[in-house]
């Protein structure tokens, strides 16, 4: 990839890092509304980062004429599509807060391993020179969700232990068409799963605190 094409990646990632909530990873005792606000903010930043990464990877590696057919083939690629998690806001509103938190935790934990290999597919890009930054952000969100679960624990069965699964690692062989398609698919799933987690958290926050920002 040409040096000029790396610039948007670097600028986007740098901006998101600057906007990331301070004292990341720390969830001291605080009001429930603050726990939800922090978790939602982290999920929003991660979803935006995933969406921008997917878009830039697509622009750099996937010919425009092939994108539509490839995207259709990716529909059944994400393992998260095989679990009984809500697929949108309306379905999420029919689930309890604890169910949504457990699905959110499952989605986040499924990416903790794969994101540690991101730097291997972006070896010429400063954006993912250290993939542990993305890993740390996922860990921050994981801790935030776990803090909420502790506050709302209701004794219901834990689905995460039954459905827990992870994605394959990203493929570093960027000269292979198969590897490019695999990484493209993984980034698509990363974006979709973080969008789901963000949606679940926002639904919970809105129905508990009836905010004007609930229209999303």
Curated annotation (Swiss-Prot):
A GO BP entry: response to nutrient levels
UniProt subcellular location: Secreted
Binding positions for Zn(2+) per the UniProt entry: 45, 198
Keywords, ordered alphabetically: Disulfide bond, Hormone, Metal-binding, Phosphoprotein, Secreted, Signal, Zinc
Regions annotated as coiled coil: none
CDD domains: somatotropin_like
Record's signal peptide: 1-26
Highest taxon of the lineage: Eukaryota
Task performed by this protein: Plays an important role in growth control. Its major role in stimulating body growth is to stimulate the liver and other tissues to secrete IGF1. It stimulates both the differentiation and proliferation of myoblasts. It also stimulates amino acid uptake and protein synthesis in muscle and other tissues.
Family from the record: Belongs to the somatotropin/prolactin family.
Protein name (database record): Somatotropin
Gene encoding the protein: Gh1
């Amino acid at each position: 990839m040409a040096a000029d094409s790396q610039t948007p990646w670097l600028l986007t990632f740098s901006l998101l890092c600057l906007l990331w909530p301070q004292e990341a990873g720390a969830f001291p005792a605080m009001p429930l509304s603050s726990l939800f606000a922090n978790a939602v903010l982290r999920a929003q930043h991660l979803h935006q980062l995933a969406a921008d990464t997917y878009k830039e990877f697509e622009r750099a590696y996937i010919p425009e004429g092939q994108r539509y057919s490839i995207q259709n083939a990716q529909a059944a690629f994400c393992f998260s599509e095989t679990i009984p998690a809500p697929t949108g806001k309306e379905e999420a509103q029919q689930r309890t807060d604890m169910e949504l938190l457990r699905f959110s935790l499952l989605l986040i934990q499924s990416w903790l391993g794969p994101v540690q290999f991101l730097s291997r597919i972006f070896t010429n890009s400063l954006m993912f020179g250290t993939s542990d930054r993305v890993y740390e952000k996922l860990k921050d969100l994981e801790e935030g969700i776990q803090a909420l679960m502790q506050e709302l624990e209701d004794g219901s069965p834990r689905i995460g232990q039954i459905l827990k699964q992870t994605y394959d690692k990203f493929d570093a062989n960027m000269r292979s068409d198969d590897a490019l398609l695999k990484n493209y698919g993984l980034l698509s799933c990363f974006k979709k799963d973080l969008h789901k987690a963000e949606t679940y958290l926002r639904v919970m926050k809105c129905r508990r605190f009836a905010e004007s920002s609930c229209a999303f």
